[in-house]
Amino acid sequence: MTNEQLQRKHQSLATLITRIIFLVLGLITIGIFIQSYYFSNKIIKQEVMLTKQQTSALVKSLFNNHLSILQIHHDSNSKNEAIRRFFLDGDDEKLEYYFLSMDQADPTHTPEFRFLTTGEGLLWDDGNAHFYGVNEVLLEKISQSVLFGNNWHFMSLHTLMGLRNMLVRRSPVIDTTTGEVLGQYYISVVLDNNFPLVEMLESGSNSDNIVMLVGDKVISHSLSGNEPYDLDSLLAMRDEPSAFDDCLISHTPIEINSTDTLVSILAIQENSHVASLQRQHYLGLATSVVLMLMLSLAIRSWIQNRVANALESLMAYSRFAGTGEKYERFNGSDILEFAHIGHTLENTFEQLESQRRSFQDLFNFALSPMMVWSESGLLIQMNPAAMKELGIEHASPQDFSNPLFQLFKLKLSPHLKMAAQGATLTGINVPIGEKIFRWNLSPIVVENGISGIIVQGQDITTLIDAEKQSNLARREAEQSAKTRADFLAKMSHEIRTPLNGILGIAQLLKRSVNDAENLKQVDVLCNSGEHLLAVLNDILDFSKIEQGKFNIKKRDFNFYDTLNTLENIYRPICREKGVSFEIHNQIPLDCQLHTDQVRLNQIMFNLISNAVKFTPAGRIEVSFKLEQFARSEHSILSIQVSDTGIGIDESKLESIFEPFVQADSLSTREYGGSGLGLTIVKNLVEMLEGEISVQSELCKGSTFYLSIPVEKGECEEQKTPTNPKPEQLFGQGLKVLLVEDNHTNAFILKAFCQKYQMSVEWVQDGTQALEKLKEHAFDLILMDNQLPKMGGIEATREIRETLKLGTPIYACTADAQESTKQEFLSAGANRVIVKPIKEQELHDELLHFKAHYWVEH
């Protein structure tokens, strides 16, 4: 765009400043005009409103005063001797003479007509009523309309001369001697064409004219016909007249006895002085506008003469420097701001030139390849590093035709097209030969669109190789972890299977042996098996924690169940060992808590088992407390497990929760254990979003503190569980199908079931189980997992899907993996029991079976 085009498109600074000043002055003038007009108009309106209110009040006062004087005269006349004598002797001459003298004494406050009545009807009238078209009949009608009180009454009466609007009042005439009411004395004020009343209101209120209305009808007025307005225009302007009209109208509604009537009075006053004030105000505002306009023109001329030359010099310098040619120093300006702008431009141009050289050096000497492409995909420029990687020695067309560059351009082209549409691309891997480069593409966005694309590359060949090695190592680690998990699962199955036989036989022997020495030997066998099972469970739990497969399942449960379990398990153990065991509970027994009951029990079992193991004598105390904190959605279950055992050295407290760690090697040899119990406890507490800490003193004991967030549920009445004897659990013998390939396990389960008077049929694989189920009906199926020919999971699925049987299936497996349990449940099993199966555990499962599935025949 040329300078001439720029000049046509843009305005000069002098013109812009002039227009801004003109605009500012104009806005100020308009603001002053609006403000002045608003306040002046408001003041005039307030003054007009005040005048109207004063006039209205004066008119109302004059009208009421006129009625008050008439009322005073009326009441005074009714007590006069002449009127009383008329009722007694009928001397109307004296009566008429009396009223004539009264009218002459005060002609202004004289009623239009008078009349007297008795109980028998009209007695006398002054004859003036006929001038208003009111005859004797109408007088009777008036007297009948005004029967009560001595107040003024407004009425509209159809007379012989048309509709008449009048005010009527009566006053009783009383015989002062006897107190007898002789009759009624009536007076009437006719409002129609009542010129004396109108003139009195006009002169008293200092008004130019008075118009009396009944509703919208004019009944009397003082207009002569020479006024610049007529009755119709006055009626149109009476409610909302302009404050600047030539006349001011005050509308006064008339009240009779504090009651609104249809009568109202318009008072018209000249308003020329207000209109004159308005015209003078407008003239003053117009003069102000003209003066402001002249001042703006003078300022414009001064700015153009003072600023234009200096500004033109500055513009010439900027145009010269902007051409890209070598520029000269700025010559300066008399105006401080222009001089500052000129020297700033001078410094800016120098800095831009320096930056251009720096950017060019950065581009040329960068170790990473850099290129500039056009939006159409043509190479504009590349730095030496890019030329080196692409095998280009000189920027000639022959060098750009080599296969390496053409292959690179072919792979980069799709990304160039995306960047040409405005997208910024990062992390694009495009190789050059054997090397892999990661490229970033950034479009150069200017006012008219995209002028080019900057492409920057980084050699990531080493990084890619390292990533490949990392992925390989990760896959090997995952395979190793999977192999270890599979090994643990197999070892768990291989250990649990014979362990089920050992513990099962031990439990059977415990019931049948009576000799104390033999019973002691059986206890050793049971304890050894239990210890081996605990070590195995700890190893499997630790493996699950390492693999992140330990799941938390929160639900509502009765806290009493946990207390009862701890009491039943550890009190006999402690009693046998000679250790005092106490539980201090501050939580209501019927309280419902919401957390993972299984993991909470596991935490307590580990901590209390450790306390029992490492406390040869003394006491073990467990305390529970539920705390609620303000502005917290959860309660805190505070647990404290204390013992008076061997204690822990202070230097070993920091590592006590690490895996395979005990206080010292002597403890391991003397007390045994895997060293995983506290590690599992700490991980479980953290999974429950809680905290655990320990205080201990060597040879004095240890105390573990736990804080676990829980949700408190509704309290329920605690029911004492019943524990029937095995032979009484079922009313009749159950038919049980036992699917087990191991003879020892089958023997033990059959022995356990015989205590419950069950009829057990034993098959050794899934195929035999299906054949047996086709021929016979069973109440319960006990299903092993790893079976010959057809496994337990597959057999369970066949029972549900092929045979369509709903017989409860309780899986009995030595595989403690969660995945195995889920596979069994998905196939259709109702429960999963992990071997080795203890007698009490089987009893609990049979209680569950009775409560949920068994129907007594």
From Swiss-Prot:
Ranges for domain Histidine kinase: 490-712
Entry protein name: Autoinducer 2 sensor kinase/phosphatase LuxQ
CDD domains reported for this sequence: HATPase_EvgS-ArcB-TorS-like, HisKA, REC_hyHK_CKI1_RcsC-like
Disulfide bonds: none
Cellular location(s): Cell inner membrane
InterPro entries per UniProt: AI-2_sensor_kinase/phosphatase, CheY-like_superfamily, HATPase_C_sf, His_kinase_dom, HisK_dim/P_dom, HisK_dim/P_sf, LuxQ-periplasm_dom, LuxQ-periplasm_N
Sorted UniProt keywords: ATP-binding, Cell inner membrane, Cell membrane, Hydrolase, Kinase, Membrane, Nucleotide-binding, Phosphoprotein, Protein phosphatase, Transferase, Transmembrane, Transmembrane helix, Two-component regulatory system
MF terms in GO: ATP binding; histidine phosphotransfer kinase activity; phosphoprotein phosphatase activity; phosphorelay sensor kinase activity
Gene: luxQ
Any single Gene Ontology cellular-component annotation: plasma membrane
Domain Response regulatory span(s) in chain numbering: 735-850
Job description of the protein: At low cell density, in absence of autoinducer has a kinase activity, and autophosphorylates on a histidine residue. The phosphoryl group is then transferred to an aspartate residue in the response regulator domain. The phosphoryl group is transferred to LuxU, and ultimately to LuxO. At high cell density, in the presence of autoinducer, the kinase activity is inactivated, and the response regulator domain has a phosphatase activity.
TM helices/strands, residue ranges: 20-40, 283-303
A Pfam family recorded for this sequence: HATPase_c
Organism whose genome encodes this protein: Vibrio vulnificus (strain YJ016)
